[in-house]
Amino acid sequence: MPELPEVETVRRSLERTVSGKTISSVKVFHPKMIRGMEVAPFVDALKQERIERVERRGKFLLFTFDRFYLVSHLRMEGKYFPYPQAIEKDKHTHVIFRFTDGSELHYNDVRKFGTMELREKETAMSVPPLAQLEREPFDPTFTAEVLAENLIRKKRSPIKTSLLDQSIFLGLGNIYVDETLFAARVHPLTKAGALTLDDISRIHAAGVDVLAKAVESGGSTIRSYVSPTGKGEFQLQLAVYGQTGAPCPRCGTAIEKIKVGGRGTHFCPTCQQVAL
């Protein structure tokens, strides 16, 4: 699933390619992707509307119009591809936005899990799913103290599963939680309630740093992720994720993989000790 760095990379690409364009028509080939209304009113609402800019909240893309947002979640395999002119859709293209200049934006999704929803600007941030999100990790008001307060309600849960909650630490997914905990030297099975403020401070600093570096590298291309402009490169810097059996870059111990909350989890058994 694309995490914050991948979604931010997609956002930046879309901002360059579709911001300022006016939609002339929309074709929806998989109606279940459209949430909150039927396909017909969704299509009608977007006709002749101009994309002012493309924003992001956590892992959600927000196409900004005059009165509303188009809130898009890529889920597992969602991708956007801009084209300078109309082209024939492939079998995995489920939504096509046609612009008044003749260009198109195709939404492609092999798994068909992605969603699109129109939300009024006045209420979008105060109702789910956007209302449930923590502030952006790069927001200076998101401090280690805020993270510590958030973790209080997860004190009996492993820190790995706690950090996957977008109301705890926005933007982290399976890849970047593993990398964050390795950088912070915290075992993924450590209960959130067993962490010291120093532990939480290291997790906070590591999480923000990992996400920032991943954004700079265009995200991580693991399996099928690509942005509209190509593949990410942060996978070349991953210390533990996907490195089962490889030597730890700090101590040389073989990286191990376990299941935590049903998610494959990578860690160094020497550098990351369980706090009881």
Swiss-Prot record:
Cofactor notes: Binds 1 zinc ion per subunit.
GO molecular function, one term: damaged DNA binding
EC number of this enzyme: 3.2.2.23, 4.2.99.18
CDD domains, A to Z: EcFpg-like_N
A single BP term in Gene Ontology: base-excision repair
Zinc finger (FPG-type): 239-273
Chain residues that bind DNA: H92, R111, K155
Covalent S-S links between cysteines: none
Keywords of this entry: DNA damage, DNA repair, DNA-binding, Glycosidase, Hydrolase, Lyase, Metal-binding, Multifunctional enzyme, Zinc, Zinc-finger
Active site annotation, chain numbering: P2 (schiff-base intermediate with dna), E3 (proton donor), K59 (proton donor), R263 (proton donor)
Cofactor(s) the record lists: Zn(2+)
Function: Involved in base excision repair of DNA damaged by oxidation or by mutagenic agents. Acts as a DNA glycosylase that recognizes and removes damaged bases. Has a preference for oxidized purines, such as 7,8-dihydro-8-oxoguanine (8-oxoG). Has AP (apurinic/apyrimidinic) lyase activity and introduces nicks in the DNA strand. Cleaves the DNA backbone by beta-delta elimination to generate a single-strand break at the site of the removed base with both 3'- and 5'-phosphates.
Family label: Belongs to the FPG family.
Record's subunit section: Monomer.
Protein's name in the database: Formamidopyrimidine-DNA glycosylase
Organism: Exiguobacterium sibiricum (strain DSM 17290 / CCUG 55495 / CIP 109462 / JCM 13490 / 255-15)
